[in-house]
């Protein structure tokens, strides 16, 4: 009896020892365990292409930094992923999700790397990046005027391939050609056709999403609630979106543009701005008139160097030169628009003109530039956004513009972008993006610089401007745009039982009354909150399910 008891105790002790040892090994080597698991889904002998990178690989840092668009997040102290996967197909995404979940690693999904806070490639806990660079096909169906776009495709690739198939079709999305469709579409996505057709997210008709269980869902199998949520509510909250089906829209064979510079005393400039903010949102959908401001050094008539504010009034008009000049002279004669200020361009050349990748004086555009994923010169940047519902008083506008003088020359910029058009006609609950009727324009506050040691200086300038404009923009809540993510609005503490209460503070700024519906969807499809970041949609606590 004694021997039997002793033997049982001894065997249990040995089993406990080995279990403890294995648990310690598992905890100590999450990367090793992840790679072992992943080998079942991405066998190394299937393709010559390298799809998985660890910190010991020669090209790890070049892959990591290749699409980091904000150089604030390339320092040695920036958290780095244990592993980067670059899937070729949905099965590779499935494997990455299941293996990350199995070993307790977080996932960050990167499409184009333009996340303003770097949250598509940074985490404060051990994590894996799913980099979708290899999944960038764009398949056009001209007959149905639709396209399937993989989430690793850039906006430039989308515009290029649509135009290759039909010059009178396009898609309502952003200006920057290197922005990835994965994040841009799922956060809303506005651009040159916003007043005509709404956001990118308004024109998505299906999607392929890999959920927390590794299942691939389309619109029918995911259900309308989840399909609603991923169009403007941030797809990364609910899974990894592999592809989008988009509705293509009609564009004119030719459009007319101008971008005129106004260099004048600030009080005279503010009179123009005041006229603009009272009229730009009221124009018909066919005309987009926006303006931006930046400081430049000039030499005055006495040969002295001085810093001044340059303002640019820019347009896209779905019509001819004569019609645009006539319209501007009747509605906004103070701008003094002449025929010589205008250019007639094809739609694809209009996109290139405002893409930021060509010189404004260029007229010989090559659309292949839209396929260049490198994006040219990169910089550190910070950006915030406000929505304006009523005209800002001239005295306040003077102070706002003068704040550009408080920043280094050429670093700070403001963009005023009009609403109106079809945006007034779409319900604020049609998709999670709620910013619709009642908004007259947006203000983008931007700082872009080169030296990382100046990060805090420039970020603080943006914060100062943002604080000053508080009384003049949307209120209760002060609204924000998910694609210009802003961690100053708040972060979620995942260890806190009150993370819903914390998230509601910033969540209602991004989503308004749609926030609670997003929480309900999250609770249903990802109750354990596997897909999360500092500003992710939280599930309700278990007691509320």
From Swiss-Prot:
Cross-link (6-(S-cysteinyl)-8alpha-(pros-histidyl)-FAD (His-Cys)): 114-176
Predominant location: secreted
Cofactor: FAD
Protein name as annotated: Cannabidiolic acid synthase-like 2
Positions with a binding annotation for substrate: 292, 417
One GO MF term attached to the UniProt entry: FAD binding
Top-level taxon of origin: Eukaryota
Family under the similarity heading: Belongs to the oxygen-dependent FAD-linked oxidoreductase family.
PROSITE patterns listed in its UniProt record: FAD_PCMH
Localization of this protein: Secreted
Ranges of residues in domain FAD-binding PCMH-type: 77-251
Pfam family, one: BBE
Encoding gene, per UniProt annotation: CBDAS3
Lineage: Eukaryota, Viridiplantae, Streptophyta, Embryophyta, Tracheophyta
Cofactor binding comment, as recorded: Binds 1 FAD per subunit in a bicovalent manner.
Post-translation changes: The FAD cofactor is bound via a bicovalent 6-S-cysteinyl, 8alpha-N1-histidyl FAD linkage.
Disulfide bridge positions per record: 37-99
Active site: 484
Organism whose genome encodes this protein: Cannabis sativa (Hemp)
Residues glycosylated per entry: 45, 65, 89, 168, 297, 305, 329, 361, 467, 499
SUPFAM superfamilies registered for this protein in UniProt: FAD-binding/transporter-associated domain-like
UniProt keywords, alphabetically: Disulfide bond, FAD, Flavoprotein, Glycoprotein, Secreted, Signal
